């Protein structure tokens, strides 16, 4: 097998940044001319994160093939500039589901099904499946923290793989915390020592230790960690806190991280070309201005719920050479009386996707404020649906206009449940109703959109047909198409068969656009998404116009 595998584990505590570390390593190896892929293995029992509460899990990231995945896949795609798929994310739930399906089918010939070998073999199959596309390197991030009971089958599987594939084909990287105690004025290595001890008790000896820390650790401290953790001194690296997450690949490169990996895995000795990353950081560090974007949502207390959105707005800032300041506004707190105060100073207003009726009226009030005061507005998924509801109520005069999701009894369901649509990937019509399961039953993944010439959407894309990622079960009710068009709403993007509305906009507004899809999932720092580029461009014009007091 030509593929080399790098396994990334984490210790001491969660949220150390394994996903960013894996993505940054992948970016460095790709910059060396290698073909790279990345996989995330999540220990939770849910089959996928599709029905999980955003406050617990954060964003659900959607791939082209319709997989609902961990938000770390967003980091992977943004840093690699590659499209990933379902096989790049597995959970304990999906692994156990496969095992149980095989048992019910009789594949195990009546044998007793156990964690070892059946579950661990299924995990190994998922990992080795990455080699089918023949990448030079496959990075596998093990979710959770070493010592968690849920993660033990995954750790056992990657322990076995080194024996299966050989030492030249496997590398273990352990990310750990090295806290800095200000009172003592020094870093402490004991948490790292205990974390590695826990990992070794499972049978895994890390080859490289990556130390998450506030400031770079000294050579003396690296020697100490190397001694007690039984690794080479030049295999201990710092992962220092940075102001901009896109600096991480450059920091790793300065430490020689990619070179050490190349030596240990006997990869081609080619220097990394990081010119595009250096240009990116220079642009971020030297903005020509700044804009403030108000994000009106209900998950604002956990910024991870809007992770890709946050990054896509930053990308839009890079394209326009401005710093983007994000102000998160809780939609549940917005009233008719305070909407102007809540959104004062915003150069642009964005209403993101979401589910459920909570906070919807605050979003609709925000959209009306943006429309009437000519503030650039961008609505995504539910944000587009709310824009349609607002227009129906306040322009068409349909006071009870609503979505079937929020009010099943209204006479004017301008947004209603999708009951069928054509899935071009399957070549078949998908059908749903109100009794369908919630998990995995939305319109998911990349679908084509036909863009109407002469519109803002056309100006952004410069193309007649684009593919965008979706995650929704409600849609615009075409019974209101003509009435809204007569009142000035432009339908600038439709499905190829003309049945589904994908983009709406207002031509007599500085920039007012809503889309049913999630463009944030297809934006990366090197190629900002056209709609985010144009939205920030309009916000920049608003900021330069000095109209913040409106």
Curated annotation (Swiss-Prot):
Pfam families associated with the record: CTP_synth_N, GATase
Activity regulation summary: Allosterically activated by GTP, when glutamine is the substrate; GTP has no effect on the reaction when ammonia is the substrate. The allosteric effector GTP functions by stabilizing the protein conformation that binds the tetrahedral intermediate(s) formed during glutamine hydrolysis. Inhibited by the product CTP, via allosteric rather than competitive inhibition.
Entry binding sites for Mg(2+): 72, 141
Catalytic activity: UTP + L-glutamine + ATP + H2O = CTP + L-glutamate + ADP + phosphate + 2 H(+); L-glutamine + H2O = L-glutamate + NH4(+); UTP + NH4(+) + ATP = CTP + ADP + phosphate + 2 H(+)
Record's miscellaneous remark: CTPSs have evolved a hybrid strategy for distinguishing between UTP and CTP. The overlapping regions of the product feedback inhibitory and substrate sites recognize a common feature in both compounds, the triphosphate moiety. To differentiate isosteric substrate and product pyrimidine rings, an additional pocket far from the expected kinase/ligase catalytic site, specifically recognizes the cytosine and ribose portions of the product inhibitor.
Family, similarity comment: Belongs to the CTP synthase family.
HAMAP family: PyrG
Protein name: CTP synthase
Classification of source organism: Bacteria, Pseudomonadati, Thermodesulfobacteriota, Desulfovibrionia, Desulfovibrionales
């Amino acid at each position: 097998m030509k593929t080399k595998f790098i396994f990334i584990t984490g210790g001491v505590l969660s949220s150390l940044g394994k996903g960013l570390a894996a993505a940054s390593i992948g970016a460095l190896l790709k910059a060396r001319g290698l073909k790279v892929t990345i996989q995330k293995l999540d220990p939770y029992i849910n089959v996928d994160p599709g029905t999980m509460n955003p406050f617990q899990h954060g964003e659900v990231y959607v791939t082209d093939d319709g997989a609902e995945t961990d938000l770390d896949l967003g980091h992977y795609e943004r840093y690699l500039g590659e499209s990933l798929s379902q096989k790049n994310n597995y959970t304990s739930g999906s692994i156990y589901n496969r095992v149980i399906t095989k048992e019910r089918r009789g594949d195990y010939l009546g044998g007793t099904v156990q964690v070892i070998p059946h579950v661990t073999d299924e995990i190994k199959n998922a990992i080795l499946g990455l080699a089918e596309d023949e990448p030079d390197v496959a990075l596998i991030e093990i979710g959770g923290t070493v010592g968690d009971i849920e993660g033990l089958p995954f750790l056992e599987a990657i322990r076995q793989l080194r024996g299966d594939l050989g030492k030249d084909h496997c590398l273990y990287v352990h990310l750990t915390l090295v806290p800095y105690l200000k009172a003592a004025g020094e870093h402490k290595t004991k948490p790292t020592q205990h974390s590695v001890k826990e990992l070794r008790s499972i049978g895994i000896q890390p080859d490289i230790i990556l130390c998450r820390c506030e400031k770079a650790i000294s050579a003396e401290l690296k020697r100490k960690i190397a001694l007690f953790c039984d690794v080479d001194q030049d295999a201990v690296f710092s992962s220092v806190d940075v102001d901009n997450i896109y600096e991480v690949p450059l920091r790793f490169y300065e430490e020689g991280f990619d070179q050490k990996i190349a030596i240990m895995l006997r990869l081609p000795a080619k220097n990394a070309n990081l010119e595009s990353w250096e240009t990116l950081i220079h642009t971020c560090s030297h903005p020509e201005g700044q804009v403030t974007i108000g994000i009106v949502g209900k998950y604002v207390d956990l910024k991870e719920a809007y992770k890709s959105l946050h990054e896509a707005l930053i990308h839009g800032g890079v394209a326009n050479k401005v710093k983007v300041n994000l102000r998160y506004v809780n939609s549940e707190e917005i009233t008719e009386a305070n909407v102007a105060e809540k959104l004062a100073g915003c150069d642009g207003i964005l209403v993101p996707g979401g589910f459920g009726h909570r906070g919807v009226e605050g979003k609709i009030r925000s959209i009306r404020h943006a429309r009437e005061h000519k503030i650039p507005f961008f609505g995504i998924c539910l944000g587009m649906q709310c824009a349609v509801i607002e227009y129906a109520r306040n322009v068409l005069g349909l006071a009870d206009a609503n979505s079937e999701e929020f009010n099943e009894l209204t006479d004017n369901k301008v947004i209603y449940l999708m009951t069928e649509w054509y899935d071009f990937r399957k070549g078949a019509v998908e059908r749903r109703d109100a009794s369908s399961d919630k998990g995995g039953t939305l319109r998911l993944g990349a679908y084509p959109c036909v863009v109407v010439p002469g519109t803002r959407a056309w100006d952004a894309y410069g193309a007649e047909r684009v593919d965008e990622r979706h995650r929704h079960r409600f849609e615009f009710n075409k019974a209101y198409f003509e009435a809204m068009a007569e009142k000035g709403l432009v339908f600038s993007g439709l499905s190829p068969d003309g049945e589904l509305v994908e983009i709406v906009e207002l031509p007599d507004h500085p920039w007012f656009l809503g889309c049913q899809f999630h463009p944030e999932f297809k934006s990366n720092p090197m190629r900002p998404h056209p709609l985010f580029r144009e939205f920030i461009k309009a916000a920049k014009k608003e900021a330069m116009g000095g109209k913040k007091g409106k």
